[in-house]
């Protein structure tokens, strides 16, 4: 068979295959006492992490929670690897759902760019109801980065689409070490 015919037949065969559609990003809004943050969650690349986050959203467990931690370049004197994030959590007194498996950036292909949403964790497979938002590029939070000694990084799962100025306003709140003195209330987190 001639090479041109083979290419033509291959092109026809590919067109005949059913289209593979990735899930569309899921839009959410995080309403805080300092303003709103809009974001898109990437369930196509981080399905386990997005499902976990949405479980808390749909159960309204982030409503009444807060941003309690602000990490800046100046308030981590004992850390050789510096990062910049704000960290939020579910409302006090709400039970955590079971922890989830870590979806490392080496698997998802997502990276910790400015405005990335990611899950906080201690060890691998321990993430539950705390998340953070990055300020600036944070490659040390990716797989192979050195912020967590295990080198597994953190599970990035979304990105801020509007409201980075609110993220920076939260980061600028007065802190005692890295704890925000008057935590910023999460009024509501909802799908848009």
Residue ranges with predicted function:
Residues 16-192:
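Cyclophilin-like peptidyl-prolyl cis-trans isomerases
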Residues 2-16:
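Bacterial N-terminal signal peptides
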């Amino acid at each position: 068979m001639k090479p041109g015919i083979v290419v033509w037949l291959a092109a026809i065969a590919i067109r005949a295959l059913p289209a593979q559609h990735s899930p569309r990003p899921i839009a959410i809004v995080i309403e805080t006492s300092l303003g709103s943050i809009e974001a898109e969650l990437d369930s196509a690349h981080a399905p386990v992490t997005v499902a976990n986050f949405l479980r808390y959203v749909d159960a309204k467990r982030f409503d009444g929670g807060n941003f309690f931690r602000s990490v800046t370049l100046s308030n981590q004197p004992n850390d050789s690897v510096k990062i910049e994030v704000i960290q939020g959590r579910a409302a006090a007194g709400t039970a955590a759902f079971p922890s989830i498996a870590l979806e490392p950036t080496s698997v998802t292909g997502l990276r910790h760019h400015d405005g990335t949403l990611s899950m906080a964790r201690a060890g691998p497979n321990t993430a539950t109801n705390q998340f953070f938002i990055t300020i600036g590029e944070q490659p040390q939070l990716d797989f192979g980065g050195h912020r967590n000694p295990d080198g597994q990084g953190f599970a990035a799962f979304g990105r801020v689409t509007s409201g980075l100025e609110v993220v920076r306003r939260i980061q600028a709140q007065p802190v005692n070490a890295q704890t925000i003195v008057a935590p910023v209330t999460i009024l509501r987190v909802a799908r848009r």
